[in-house]
Every structure is written in structure tokens, then in C-alpha cells.
Amino acid sequence: MESRGLTLRSRTRRARPQISAPKPISGPLPPNSKSTDSGQGNNVSQAVSRERIPTNGATSDLVKRRYSTRYNQAPEFDASAPPVPGLPAAASKYGGLGPPEASKKPSSDSSGPPQVDLNALRDPSLPVDRSNLLANATEEEIEEYQNNLRKVRNRTSTDLQQNVYQNRTQFIKISKEAEKLKGEMRTLRTLMAELTTALGQTAIGNAPNPMSPTADDWVPKRNANRSSVANLESMWNVQLQTLWKTVEGSQKFLPVAPGRHIVMETGQWVELDSATWKPRRPVHIVLLNDHLLVAAKKRKRVDASNHRGPVPTKLVAEECWPLQDVDMIDLGANMGTGAAREEAEERGIANAINVRVGSKTFTYRHDKRDSSDKGELLATFRKAVEDLRRTLRSESDTAIKPTDGFGYAGVKHSVSQKLDLNASDASRDKPEVRIDVDGKQQNLRWVDGQVDELDIDIALQRFEEAVSGIERLRKLARGLKGNSYAQQIINSKVDERAARLASVLSRALADTHSFLNATKTNVTWLTRLGFEDQAREAYLKARSDVISKRVRACVFEGDLPLYIFQVSYVYFTLIKNTINIYQQCFPAVLTSACIKWAKHHLDGFNALLTRQLSSVQRGTTVWQKCIDIVHEHADSLTEVGVDFVDLVAKGLDLHDNGGEKPQMTRSESLISGLADAARDHAF
């Protein structure tokens, strides 16, 4: 049988070709590529992990081509090339092909509760009505947002108030510096004017003839004699020290003061007796810019056995007066005519002057009858007095300026007036009035600075510092006995601040009258300021208002004993507490005012009690119950040492009508009549 014939025997089968799994590639898969069989993922991964024998064939090549993808090679970029610039911000406003940009604002779900944006609130063009910040917020988040806004508002208000106080302090400092600069400029003008005058007089006295060939040599000499302002002040100090050495006892009359200097010094004067015109003693007259000093010539004590020649003399200060208190009269101007004039000329009255200081009168005569010292002294004295008056007037104008104010506007107005440096020219060319403060010389600007500090303490309610400052300035004013002008200015300023502070303390006392410590503190401050009467009146008035308010709160609802209980409790409890606090806050000498106040309110209570019991039968149970309640409450006054038992319910007790038997009411009399009728019927 041929081999190619049909047979039932099994033949050897050829192995079928296996399709190899897809080989992994180095590049990423396309986004649209998907796995052909997701259910066989695990089998494929296991098949890939095993090593397989590569098979060759057309079928495998076709399958490889089917499951393979070719990618182009990535371009090579230069690392040194600059980066690509970003898109401008304006490009985001226009729509494009790209996906829409996600919103930058965090949602309420992801970012939590809304926060207060201070930068947005500072924007004046903020559209408040269009804001959608709280559109999706819960009620708790809205309340929290409101609380945050309130905190921001309170913090802003506090910052604004602190800025106002800081600006006020800066304004005050600026005003002080301006006043100080103004005074320095005034002093500089004065010194320069006096220096110019002195140099002019020196030039006139030392200038040679212009026709002289040495005229050119005089110019450098004049320039060499010029001195600075500081040297002029030093020269004045040297003059005073020389005066102290020359005139014994002059230092106690003329201590060192800024601007004090000698204007004129003249000798060869004789003091005359005002009644007999006889010479008493030789004197030496020294005229300063603010005082007039008279020194007497006295002999020195020397040993007569060892001394030969004339006896030496010394100058001793006898009289010294403020220049504004002195009047100097020329006696030679009113000598008359005829024999009286001849007699006056023989006595030397033509060269005599009369000095008046208050009620005292002094007469001085110059020894040289043909000398011009008297006329020069009179002219220099008048000029010095006029200069001193102009200086005092300048200080008065500066002090009268309204520089006081509590608010921001008041300070601004005061500073604007202080900065007026173009005041009258006549008030800025002379030295200022000086006062002695703890051994140091101060001017009135120092007083203004202390007053400004008082204003700040009062505005900030630093009462202890304000009261201490007022006491210090008052003590300073009491010590200025020789300077009535400065004393008057200081007292006027201090009294104004004291009255203002007393009004503030009185309001505080009326607000805290029920508290012992606060009342005692306020009363102590008012007492130190000298307003004890105002403190007493404010306290008692506040307590009277409380009594009236509490009594009006008691309402009568038909139960008379209950109403009397309420009213009497209010009256006597408040009176007792008032007396108790008053005794601890005020001195014992003022207790009578409190007792008088208590008696006044007790009379008011008696009038109210009489009015309420006018419709009740005297002696009834209701009557007696009301009287007992009143006396029980009145006994509480004995705890503070006051006994008003005889004055309480005066005229309403039973013994006031002679102790007559209590009368029965209509109902009681009716019941009594029925009982009597029943008893008679039984008999």
C-alpha cells in the first residue's frame, strides 16, 4: 500500500507556530493605545518575564509589525540657549484654544473662613455692594468675619488716638523750640544793637582827623576792637564781679542774671536831709538795666599808730531798688524865680535830684556844680526805664496769648499763634524777665512749658501728676515775692488749670460717690487744689439725686405698710451710708454740713409719711405698724453716731395728742355695735 494513501493511523503532527508577545519598547506608548486584552494582563506579564526561544517566520514578522510603533528621534537642544519668555499678563484676559485657567481665588471649602484683607479695605474704590466674599459663607463664618472687622476698627481707632496724642506732643515741642528760637533771636538783636552803639561811640571818640595822613591806620584798629556776642556777655559778667569787689554787700542785691549789666556809674554825690537840706553822707550811684544801686562811702578801720596820710574809704551797698519802682525827679527844673531861686542856687539845689520809691523819698546832690553828670544820669535813667517797660510789655503780650486747648484743634490754633514770629518789633529787642527756680534762672517760657505739661496730664486724666504740678507752681509763685509781675502771670495760669481740673474731678466724684476708696481719692485731690467746698457740694448733691431716684422707684400698690417699709428703708439706708463715707473722706470740721443735709432729707421723709398716713385713722393697727417700721429703720442711724429718734415721724405718734385712746375704724365700730346688740338681746 502506498504511503500516500488513506490510512486510519495517526500521523505525526507538525507544531503550530507560536505568536510571540509584544516586545517592550523604549519610548512611551501613545495616549490612545489600549491593552487588547485586559483580562489576560497577568498572563502576559508572566510570559514576558520568562525567557523564550526566538522563533522565525513570516507570521511572527507580521505580528511584530502590527504591534510596533516607530518614533522619530528627539531633537537635540542647546543647553546654553536662553529660556523661552513667558506670556504677558494681558494675554490671560483673552480666550484662546488652550484650556481655561483655574480660578486663583481659593474657594470657601478649601481655604476655610474668609479673612479680612486690610489692603482691600484701604482701597477707596472698593465696591462693597458688589463683593461676593461672603456669598458661600456660613453663619458662623459671617459672625467671625464681623468680629474681625470690629477688631480692626477698634485697633484703627486706638492707633488714631495715639497718633493724635503724639502729634499734639510734637506740636507742643515744636512750639517750645519756636519760642526758644524767638527769644534767642531777640537777645541776639539786643546784643548786636548795643554792640553797634558801643562801637559807634568808640569810633567817634577815637577817630582822628580825616585830613591826617594816618587815617588809614585807624581802620584795622577799629576792626580789632570788635567782639562777639559771647564776649559781650562775658564782659557784663566781669563788670558785675568788679562791682561785687568794689561795693561791699552788692552781691546780695544783684546776683548773676542773664542780660544784667551796668549802664552808668557815677560818683561824687552827697545824700541830703530832706527836711534841713544838710549833707548826711557821700554816696556812689550805680545804674543797671533793671536796678538802681546806691552805695555809701565809709571809712575803713585802720591802726592809728601805724597809719599815716588820709584815711582810706570803702563803698558799702545801702539801697537797691527795682528800676520799675523808682521815680527820679530833677529838682533844678522847679527852683522858681527871684530870691527863692538865688537861695536854691546857694544850697546847690540846681545839681540835686529826688528819688522816690513807694512812700520813701531820697535827695542826692552832685558836688560839682558845673558838671553835666546830673543831666546824663537823668537821661540814661529815663532811657533804661523805657527799655525795661518795653521788655515787660513784650513778656505780657506773649503770656496773654491764648495758648490753651484740650482738643487737637485747640492745640493747632495755639501753635499757629506761637509761631507768629513777626510780632511787634518793639517787643523783641530786650532781655526777658527771669525767675529763680531751684537756684536756676528761668524765663516765662519755662512756665509755659510747665503749663503745657499740666494740660497733657489733665487731658490724659493723670490726676496725681496734674495736682502735684499745680502745687509745685503755686509754691513757686509764693516764693516770687519780689517779682509781682511774674507771680501774677503764674497764678493766673495755675488757677485756670486748677479750676478746669476741679470740674473734671467733680464729675468723677459724682460718678463714683457710692465707692469709698474712689470718693476718698477724688476728695483728697480736690482738697489739695483748694476746692473743698466744691467737693462737698458735688458729693452731697450726687447722694440727693440717688435718694430721689430710689424713692421714685417705689410704687404704691395698695399695701401701705409695704410702701412705707420701702420708702423708709431707702431714706435711712442712704442717709446712713452717706454719713459714713462723708466722715471718712472729709475733715471733722465740715461734719455740720452733712448733718444739715441729713436733716433736710429727714424733713422730706416726714412730709411724705404725713401725706401717706393722712387717710389712715390715727391709732389703728395699720397706723401703728407703719410707725413701728419707720422707727426701726431710723434706729440704724445710731451706727454712724447720729440720733434722729425724736425727729422721725414728728407729730404722728400717739403721745403727741395727749395719749388719748386709739379710735376704732368704721368696720371695728360696726363689729363692736353688733356685739353690744347681741349681748343686750341675750339679757
From Swiss-Prot:
Family matches, as SUPFAM superfamilies: Cullin repeat-like, PH domain-like
Any single Gene Ontology cellular-component annotation: transport vesicle
InterPro entries the record matches: Cullin_repeat-like_dom_sf, Exo84, Exo84_C, Exo84_C_1, Exo84_C_2, PH-like_dom_sf
> Which domain of life does the UniProt lineage start with?
Eukaryota
Q: Which GO terms describe its biological process?
A: exocytosis; Golgi to plasma membrane transport; protein localization; protein transport
Record carries keyword Coiled coil: yes
Annotated transmembrane regions: none
Task: Report the subcellular localization.
Answer: Cytoplasmic vesicle, Secretory vesicle
Its protein name is: Exocyst complex component exo84
Q: Which organism is it from?
A: Aspergillus fumigatus (strain ATCC MYA-4609 / CBS 101355 / FGSC A1100 / Af293) (Neosartorya fumigata)
